[in-house]
Amino acid sequence: MHDKTWSGRFNEPVSELVKQYTASIGFDRRLAEWDIQGSLAHAQMLKETGVLDEGDLADIRRGMAEILEEIRSGKIEWSSDLEDVHMNIERRLTDKIGDAGKRLHTGRSRNDQVATDIRLWLRDQITVIRSLIQSLQTALLDLAEQNAETVMPGFTHLQVAQPVSFGHHMLAYVEMLGRDNERMADCRCRVNRMPLGAAALAGTTYPIQREITAELLGFEQICQNSLDAVSDRDFAIEFTAAASLVMVHLSRLSEELILWMSPRFGFIDIADRFCTGSSIMPQKKNPDVPELVRGKSGRVIGHLIGLITLMKSQPLAYNKDNQEDKEPLFDTADTLIDTLRIYADMMRGVTVKPDNMRAAVMQGFATATDLADYLVKKGMPFRDAHEVVAQAVRHADEAGVDLSELPLEVLQGFSDLIADDVYGVLTPEGSLNARNHLGGTAPEQVRFQVKRWREMLA
């Protein structure tokens, strides 16, 4: 038997260099279990349409069960001479059961076979990812609930802007991850379309019934155009784009954790098990996990660009270029799953330092907007109030104190609308409580959102 299933057409064997260059078994063998799933469903359909008999189907099932056990136990020997996971499994099956193994590929091409395998694999990865996103959301909700009344500076341009609740800040990431989860679910709808039956590119002359295979494999839809079915990698790009957004969100949170852990901020501490030391500086405690997440986000974004570039100039239908879709896709899923898993654990190891957060609020005139709103509510036009408060801030800055520390007579020098009730809005806590509306940072709203999200995730 030839090593290649297609070698009868050629007058000379493929060179060893070409074998090494074109073989994909080194990475696509991770699709083996899904390849077997697809083959078993295909065999069942061929039997129901009269292409295979009951004996062939029984032999195929028995042989595939043995191969699956060999794969799971690590006993199977993969051969680069057979190029890919599909040919390796088919050869092993034929060695075990003879002619029935040769009949399995009837009405099928590796083109629709690999497209099916990838979709089956990716569908399962998305299920895992969605569960891990929800686990991370739960960890963030725990932090938010514990810190509904913990005041911290909210920033714009990385400058102190207004007081916010630390719980409210954590909820912002819960919202981002909620959108990420929605995108993954939406992406899965398009992943869950079956290309099997498209064969090489034009369909097959055998009396196949694709509906049978789709039902057996749990596909909700069937790809309706054979050319598109074998050449489509939109679903891979879409998944990588969704994964990139998750990583971008985690990279943003990582940047904040890194800053907040710095002694210059001192807002939080991260448990020792997520940090490392220095080989030369004994005092160092480095936030390696969030730093790596920040770095790995670029890796995933790079895979997105790579996949888009891979597809941009391909004519219909299948081209060998598409062999290059798997490694970035595999690495994207692996990186995202590992990141989500470690991140949820890490967030449970975050210790909040409320006193340091409140002290930072007091250093940045964070309640200046509250003073302007106070004046507006007493009848002053907002633009005039803005100017009055700006003058008060300049005075407080020169005096080295916070607005709340200015004597009443000094504040009244800027506007006679100011009375002794002003100090109720100048404290960080007063600022938080004043924003008690849907989506606001008031502790009551934080608790409402935590409850809402817990119900959604239940």
UniProtKB/Swiss-Prot annotation:
UniProt EC number: 4.3.2.1
Entry's family note: Belongs to the lyase 1 family. Argininosuccinate lyase subfamily.
GO CC term (a single one): cytosol
Subcellular location: Cytoplasm
Reaction it catalyzes: 2-(N(omega)-L-arginino)succinate = fumarate + L-arginine
Enzyme class (EC, first level): lyase
Major subcellular site: cytoplasm
UniProt organism field: Neisseria meningitidis serogroup C / serotype 2a (strain ATCC 700532 / DSM 15464 / FAM18)
Entry protein name: Argininosuccinate lyase
Superkingdom field: Bacteria
GO MF annotation list: argininosuccinate lyase activity
Protein keywords: Amino-acid biosynthesis, Arginine biosynthesis, Cytoplasm, Lyase
Pathway: Amino-acid biosynthesis; L-arginine biosynthesis; L-arginine from L-ornithine and carbamoyl phosphate: step 3/3
Database matches in InterPro entries: Arg_succ_lyase_C, Argininosuccinate_lyase, Fumarase/histidase_N, Fumarate_lyase_CS, Fumarate_lyase_fam, Fumarate_lyase_N, L-Aspartase-like
PANTHER family reported for this sequence: ARGININOSUCCINATE LYASE
Any single biological process term in GO: L-arginine biosynthetic process
PROSITE patterns: FUMARATE_LYASES
Signal peptide extent: none
